[in-house]
């Protein structure tokens, strides 16, 4: 590929910095090898600092690209090296923090290049800014602690202590997960309890990770639990003041364990790593994870018997906390990690590493949705047990039947939670000529409100867009093309015979959740409207998937085998 620079030969390596399409594609190509380097690097970082136990709750070690900028920085440093190796005439490289400034400057000297490194600051004192951010994080932790500790006391509602051995079901939840009748909507394992035999179903207790933004959130959820027929272990009802103090002080102490920093690209990147570690001091992520760890100690002290733990496994720090908590206080209990979703390889942490397994932060077995994912999940840890399990969240998908002779005149925009990516999708569609014979329908991510979205992306108020709230399966019969990014919706669309476009990212790498799972004849990565038009013109709108995409149905037998893992 011939690499080209635009914008007066400047290379913008900031978050959100716009790249030429050629460089954006080169960055995506490079990123596949950087994933391997990144995984190896975190192992060396952990070894250099002798990390053990709760040290693994620091986000720097997690390989989650949505929690730290390390992976993104590594990719962009390799992109810069590629530009230098291809003798591109760089005048300016723009960065946004001191760590990248030092690393880029070191690469410049290493290659004998001559360009200006521009450090785009927001003005003001960097020290004061870091201090104010630290105070803000402390204030957030105090606020969360007060809500979580005080509200259960004020409600004066006793927690329910199981009187028999239980199956612990880990999941995320919010107040809106109770319907108008008071029934709990299981968005993680739908159909599991209904499919199990009565004796097994009665042993299942939901242990939700709550999204608490206001005092009423916790109050309403606890009241909802009381009305529900399901059984719940609400962590906030079990913790005491010492647990919050423990989490508070450990959230200050643990990130400071990172002191020795290996080189990357042959240059010193200690400022990048230490800055990311500093951002984790008093962070809500590490605080919540430490509370989850202590939760298992409280359960053990109350003599709660756990037969099995099912972890909604994204290999985030909260998942690590669950694994460490179980292995510390319930060492004989088996942990089943359930990945009831399909994401791209950009989400590096979803593939466990050998050093995470040795540290005890991964489940005993990890369940995936498709046979093609088994080898992917074993890439960095061949000894990790990976199996295909029932696709609980995709039951409606497996029951879907195409509507014959339907008028497919909709381009469905299934927008992700990330606003920047959603904005790119909207902007691409606005570049399609106005005499277009298709309608653009916007389906927002469940956590994003229309009001908030229009504030962030005012372009979406254009009359060519219509917001819809119907389910994907109700929309698919009339959909000619789905436009999205790294989402399970892409897989669902292909399964239902709808072609897919993955928006090409010009500010970072582009990854498709369909790569290696679905034939590329049904999807493409697009950076411009011409690609969208070509996909519409060349794709058969009545195609059927091949057998290797089949999901495991939810049956009594498959549910029983899942619980027995």
Enumerate the predicted regions with their spans:
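Catalytic-core helical/loop segments in enzymes performing group transfer/polymerization on anionic/lipid-linked
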Residues: 1-565
